[in-house]
Amino acid sequence: MVKYFVFLSLVFLMPYCNAQQVIPLYQGKVPNSKSVTNEEQRVANSDVDSLTSNVSVPTLSVYLPPKGLANGTAVIICPGGGYHVLLTKREGSDAARAFAKMGVTAFVLKYRLPNDKTMLDKSIGPLQDAQQAIKIVRHRAKEWSIDPKKIGILG
């Protein structure tokens, strides 16, 4: 009976165990950043979304389409939040999973939000992260079976 329960538990949990690769945008020091403690916060809010703020270490999360469905296109998703927070669930991972189901390789960019405390020039920080994300996806396009000329950005 215990084996049966464990088996069923694993079967039902498998769809939720789709661990994604998370890639740091920069190796070493993040450009245009001040040396401060990482104070990133993530708050789950069932009424709104999962809210991420105070990002100082930007990352790129990879959502691959199912085998045989990939169509060679990619999208980098920049979750919204009015440059105050990132809505990382609804406008990030949920959107990425929907794109992946359509055969599009999706990436969620956790980017730095304008902040005088963490950036030397807050007017260019988010743009630097978006540009770096595009460079990474183009550079590793072959690894993910992406046509480097078919990479879009959303957000």
Give residue spans per PLM region.
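Gly/Ser-rich "nucleophile elbow"/oxyanion-hole loop immediately N-terminal to the catalytic nucleophile
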Residues: 125, 136-153
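Serine-hydrolase catalytic-loop signature spanning alpha/beta hydrolases and amidase-signature enzymes
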Residues: 82-84, 106, 136
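Short amphipathic alpha-helix adjacent to the substrate-entry channel of hydrolases
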Residues: 88-108
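Short beta-strand element of the alpha/beta-hydrolase
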Residues: 71-80
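N-terminal cap/lid segment of alpha/beta-hydrolase-fold proteins
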Residues: 20-69
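Short beta-to-alpha linker loops that shape the active-site pocket of alpha/beta-hydrolase fold enzymes
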Residues: 81, 110-114
